[in-house]
Curated annotation (Swiss-Prot):
<keyword id="KW-0238">DNA-binding</keyword>
<dbReference type="GO" id="GO:0005829">
    <property type="term" value="C:cytosol"/>
</dbReference>
<dbReference type="GO" id="GO:0005524">
    <property type="term" value="F:ATP binding"/>
</dbReference>
<dbReference type="InterPro" id="IPR013765">
    <property type="entry name" value="DNA_recomb/repair_RecA"/>
</dbReference>
<dbReference type="GO" id="GO:0006310">
    <property type="term" value="P:DNA recombination"/>
</dbReference>
<dbReference type="InterPro" id="IPR020587">
    <property type="entry name" value="RecA_monomer-monomer_interface"/>
</dbReference>
<dbReference type="InterPro" id="IPR023400">
    <property type="entry name" value="RecA_C_sf"/>
</dbReference>
<comment type="function">
    <text>Can catalyze the hydrolysis of ATP in the presence of single-stranded DNA, the ATP-dependent uptake of single-stranded DNA by duplex DNA, and the ATP-dependent hybridization of homologous single-stranded DNAs. It interacts with LexA causing its activation and leading to its autocatalytic cleavage.</text>
</comment>
<feature type="binding site">
    <location>
        <begin position="68"/>
        <end position="75"/>
    </location>
    <ligand>
        <name>ATP</name>
    </ligand>
</feature>
<keyword id="KW-0547">Nucleotide-binding</keyword>
<dbReference type="GO" id="GO:0009432">
    <property type="term" value="P:SOS response"/>
</dbReference>
<keyword id="KW-0227">DNA damage</keyword>
<dbReference type="GO" id="GO:0003684">
    <property type="term" value="F:damaged DNA binding"/>
</dbReference>
<dbReference type="GO" id="GO:0016887">
    <property type="term" value="F:ATP hydrolysis activity"/>
</dbReference>
<dbReference type="InterPro" id="IPR020588">
    <property type="entry name" value="RecA_ATP-bd"/>
</dbReference>
<dbReference type="Pfam" id="PF00154">
    <property type="entry name" value="RecA"/>
</dbReference>
<dbReference type="GO" id="GO:0003697">
    <property type="term" value="F:single-stranded DNA binding"/>
</dbReference>
């Protein structure tokens, strides 16, 4: 017992010395209530994706990456997170490195564009410095960087068109993330990096796809979402949206590799009513008999599109279903925008 007591005194002395040198809380025992701390989250605006992420949304104080092919819904998903943060009274910033943000589309997704901070930086270093200053302010809830591929190093912009700049962007991302990750972890800010896909040349086995900006973001990101279009959604012959699949390829705080599918409607973003309808059918809250959908003995419509339209025209019923689904999965209720039937 004497050896154990001596070892305990030694570690207590070391802990006291570390706290004097680095401040209170620099080191602690993991069992001191840490396991009961709930990770604060922001909803993605898509209940099925919130469930797939395992904690009810995207984590605050963490880095997240959304990547996929062109026009797959990357920016749409990020803007939905911004809208959800604003509904909770939070502030958001959009670093538009691509100089391509559609303000009218953002407004249709529920983003309060009047309150959205936007920056269109001239080069990559400037974009990441802006992100760091915003994180350090500890006043921003969500920062979206769109996109990593557009974070062009200053040396490349100032050089000639044909000059070789091997590894410049990867070094920029690696250096910036080393600085950013510490600031982000001490804040309540979720930083979302949107990334594009490139093809590796000469790959014989495995996927030839890779993301831009080197490997640093893959390591530092708490969550990585791979978003893809599955197929078109048609109204008669007219294509009105896309069926979209998201795979959680990395998740440090819940089981990864979960997949979800939902509708993305042109001009409206993620179809909340379609997502809740699918989850309600899966859970048994809505009965599906043949092509008919029913809830508590009341018919919602024949066919999925008619049932979706019924829910869209009856926001109270939609809210009731979402509340039940969230309660069943122990998630806090986050009401969506109430849209009129004719919108």
């Amino acid at each position: 017992m004497g050896a154990v007591d001596e070892r305990q005194r030694a570690i207590d002395t070391a802990v006291s010395q570390i706290e004097r040198m680095c401040g209170k809380g620099a080191i602690m025992r993991l069992g001191e209530g840490a396991q009961n701390v709930e990770i604060p989250v922001i909803s993605t605006g898509c209940l099925s994706l919130d469930l797939a992420l395992g904690i009810g949304g995207v984590a605050r104080g963490r880095i997240m990456e959304i990547f996929g092919p062109e026009s797959s819904g990357k920016t749409t998903l990020a803007l939905h997170v911004v809208a959800e943060a604003q509904k909770l009274g939070g502030l958001a910033a959009f670093i538009d490195a691509e100089h391509a943000l559609d303000v009218n589309y953002a407004r249709k997704l529920g983003v309060q564009v009047e309150d959205l901070l936007i920056s269109q930086p001239d080069y990559g270093e400037q974009a990441l410095e802006i992100a760091e200053i915003l994180v350090r302010s500890n006043a921003i809830d969500v920062i979206v960087v769109d996109s990593v591929a557009a974070l062009v190093p200053k040396a490349e912009i100032e050089g000639e068109m044909g000059d070789p700049h091997v590894g410049l962007q990867a070094r920029l991302m690696s250096q910036a993330l080393r600085k950013l990750v510490s600031s982000i972890s001490k804040s309540r800010t979720c930083v979302i990096f949107i990334n594009q896909i490139r093809m590796k040349i000469g790959v014989m086995y495995g996927s030839p796809e890779t993301t831009t900006g080197g490997n640093a973001l893959k390591f530092y990101a708490t969550m990585r979402l791979d978003i893809r279009r599955v197929g078109p959604i048609k109204d008669g012959q007219e294509v009105v949206g896309n069926r979209t699949r998201v795979k959680v390829v990395k998740n440090k705080i819940a089981p990864p590799f979960r997949e979800v599918e939902f509708d993305v409607v042109y001009g409206r973003g993620i179809s909340r009513e379609g997502d809740i309808l699918d989850l309600a059918v899966e859970s048994g809250a809505i009965e599906k008999s043949g092509t008919w959908y029913s809830y508590s003995g009341e018919r919602l419509g024949q066919g999925r599109e008619n049932a979706k339209n019924f829910l869209r025209e009856h926001p109270d019923l939609l809210g009731e279903l979402e509340r039940k689904l969230r309660e069943a999965h122990n998630l806090r209720f986050s009401p969506g925008p109430v849209t009129g039937a004719g919108e």
